[in-house]
Amino acid sequence: MSLEDPFFVVRGEVQKAVNTARGLYQRWCELLQESAAVGREELDWTTNELRNGLRSIEWDLEDLEETIGIVEANPGKFKLPAGDLQERKVFVERMREAVQEMKDHMVSPTAVAFLERNNREILAGKPAAQKSPSDLLDASAVSATSRYIEEQQATQQLIMDEQDQQLEMVSGSIQVLKHMSGRVGEELDEQGIMLDAFAQEMDHTQSRMDGVLRKLAKVSHMTSDRRQWCAIAVLVGVLLLVLILLFSL
């Protein structure tokens, strides 16, 4: 199987989440079957955990469906047999049906009626029936479960507090970096101004040098012209001298 295919990673997470949800669902069903008023804390915690777990599973199933769509759109890349692809679709459909079954039970009229009746009994402080010894044992188990839930909530609160402290430290570091970046930006702006002034000075110096070079070229041209006239005068003088000598002979 291609290492780029993420199906099996997500599938394992979904299977584990469904198993956890089934455990919560079983406990939730047991709470619905108890004749005495159920503790609000345990019932609320179980209901919320189950509802959140089912919602998370649905999101994971959507991810699995996306991976199946990717494989179907790129059969040459993944080279997945048709039987394996169908097996994946069956798995997603089976998990979705299990999730939907639990969701339907949670919103069924029977469950809603029980929750409303349980809330009324808790508020009134009156149990629905006389507690038997087995009910007392169940109450003891519920009390132990409540203590466990309280401990877990306290642990989660400590973790959240530590995360808040870490976020504050990160926020402080970000502020320091922001201040440093502002200082660096100001220094870069100052250096840019200095470079602009230096460029202007270089342009002015270049202009002055061009003027000097033009003057030197002009003087050099004038000097060259004088030398040419002097040479012509000397040649004319020599020619006249030769003519005089020829005629004198």
Curated annotation (Swiss-Prot):
The chain crosses the membrane at residues 229-249. One of its GO terms (cellular component) is perinuclear region of cytoplasm. It is a single-pass type IV membrane protein. The modification N-acetylserine is found at S2. GO terms for molecular function: SNAP receptor activity; SNARE binding; syntaxin binding. Signal peptide: none annotated. Residues 2-228 are cytoplasmic. Expressed at high levels in heart, skeletal muscle and pancreas. InterPro entries: SNARE, Syntaxin-6/10/61_N, Syntaxin/epimorphin_CS, T_SNARE_dom. PROSITE patterns: SYNTAXIN (PS00914), T_SNARE (PS50192). The modification Phosphoserine is found at S108, S134, S140, S143. The modification Phosphothreonine is found at T110. Residues 157-219 form the t-SNARE coiled-coil homology domain. It is found in: Golgi apparatus membrane. One of its GO terms (biological process) is Golgi vesicle transport. It comes from the Eukaryota. Residues 41-69 form a coiled coil. Keywords: Acetylation, Coiled coil, Golgi apparatus, Membrane, Phosphoprotein, Protein transport, Transmembrane, Transmembrane helix, Transport. Interacts with VPS52. Belongs to the syntaxin family. SNARE involved in vesicular transport from the late endosomes to the trans-Golgi network. PANTHER family: GOLGI SNARE BET1-RELATED. This is Syntaxin-10. The gene is STX10.
